[in-house]
Swiss-Prot record:
Key words, A-Z: Cell membrane, Decarboxylase, Lipid biosynthesis, Lipid metabolism, Lyase, Membrane, Phospholipid biosynthesis, Phospholipid metabolism, Pyruvate, Zymogen
Membrane topology field: Peripheral membrane protein
Gene (UniProt): psd
Name of the protein: Phosphatidylserine decarboxylase proenzyme
Primary role: Catalyzes the formation of phosphatidylethanolamine (PtdEtn) from phosphatidylserine (PtdSer).
């Protein structure tokens, strides 16, 4: 995995470790997937250093990409049965919907929370629960605007099913959008993910849907902002 969250109860570092943590909190590190997008404009800036406008454009683009691919540190809650937001963004939908057919979860609607990621949000996705990965399926599709209701059905997506230690199935779906045309998923079947663990990335925004078992209590509303790995979006039955 790209980066694991700090488990609750972890002792605070001291000395140099404490200083490093302070720097990480002030300046979030870069996700490895963003490295080419930062190095390329830096190279342009270096080659065109004698031309002010080229140098400025290269440095500005590199800074923007570094911001887009930032990977901030997060600390998930330690409450039993909670589901955390799989991404930073804005809650777009809180409803009931049929999970992606490729996950074989049946045709009955399940509670769902959809989070829309803009180009200014953090692009990484984090495991909404701790558990074992049972399915990972990539589905080709269209690239409609991710804020449309039917984007979850027709757009390119990557669906992952996680089984918690209590036997609950939670599905999390990365959905490509109008600008986001590259979905990355590092998790594989059999992997054991801690809650809040980084497992994937959608380049330049998009949407992430989470499907819950029946009886789950949803704790967010449309329009609410979420912080990946920290905002509690639901309580499992």
């Amino acid at each position: 995995m790209a980066r694991r969250p700090t488990p609750p109860g972890t002792p605070q570092p001291t000395g140099i470790g404490h200083i490093v943590d302070l720097v990480r909190h002030a300046i979030p590190p870069l996700h490895p997937a963003g490295l080419p997008f930062v190095l390329a404009p830096l190279g342009v800036a270096a080659l065109g250093r004698n031309r002010k406008w080229v140098r400025r454009a290269g440095l500005t683009t590199a800074a923007a990409c570094a911001t887009f691919f930032r990977h901030p540190h997060r600390v998930p809650p330690n409450r039993i049965g909670v589901v955390v937001a799989p991404a930073d963004g804005e809650v777009a939908l809180v409803d009931n919907a049929v999970p992606p057919a490729e996950l074989n979860l049946g045709s009955e609607p399940r509670p769902r929370v959809s989070i829309f990621l803009s180009v200014l949000d953090v692009h990484v996705q984090r495991s909404p629960v701790g558990g074992t990965v049972k399915e990972v399926v990539h589905q080709a599709g269209k690239f409609l605007s991710a804020d449309l209701a039917d984007a979850s059905e027709v757009n390119e997506r990557n669906s992952m099913l996680i089984e918690t230690a209590d036997g609950h199935d939670v599905a999390v779906v990365q959905i490509a959008g109008l600008l986001a045309r590259r979905i990355v998923c590092y998790a594989g079947v059999g992997d054991v993910l801690p809650i809040g663990d980084t497992y994937g990335l959608i380049r330049f925004g998009s949407r992430v849907d989470t499907y819950f078992p029946a009886g789950t209590t949803l704790l967010v509303e449309p329009g609410q902002r979420t912080i990946g790995a920290e905002t509690v979006i639901a309580q499992l039955p």
